[in-house]
Amino acid sequence: MNQQDIKQKVLDVLDHHKVGSLATVQKGKPHSRYMTFFHDGLTIYTPTSKETHKAEEIENNPNVHILLGYDCEGFGDAYVEVAGKAKINNSAELKDKIWSSKLERWFDGKDDPNLVILEIEPEDIRLMNAGEKTPVSLEL
C-alpha cells in the first residue's frame, strides 16, 4: 500500500469514527479515557474542560496516544494508533467549528470559560487491520 492510500484510509477512519481513547501521562504512567474526536486533515481535536486531569496532564507532559476506529465486533476493523503532542487551544473560532448541542451536558455553551479544545498534532500514525498482514505507518 502506498503512502497516499495509507493516508486516505487513515482519513476514512477519522471521518467515520468519533469516539476513541485518549491516553495522557500521569505521574509517569499512561492514563486513558474515552473521548469524542474531530479532525481537520490529520490534526485531531477533542473538547474538554480546563478543570480536568487531562488538561493538567497535558500541561505537564504533552505526549498523548489515541486509538480510534473499532466498530462493534472488533475483529478485522480498521483502526488507527496516533502518537502525538497535544496542546490546549482556546480559540473561539475552533470552539465555533466543533460546538454541538451534545456538549451542553458538560458546558454552558461554546462561550463557557471552562471549555477548551485539545489539539493533537500527530508524530506517528499507524493504520491497523486495513487488509495488510502487519500495521502500516503513515510517513509524516
From Swiss-Prot:
Name of the coding gene: ydaG
Alphabetical keyword list: Stress response
Induction notes from the record: By heat shock, salt stress, oxidative stress, glucose limitation and oxygen limitation.
Protein name: General stress protein 26
The organism of origin for this protein: Bacillus subtilis (strain 168)
S-adenosyl-L-methionine is among the record's keywords: no
Annotated signal peptide: none
Any matching Pfam family: PNPOx_N
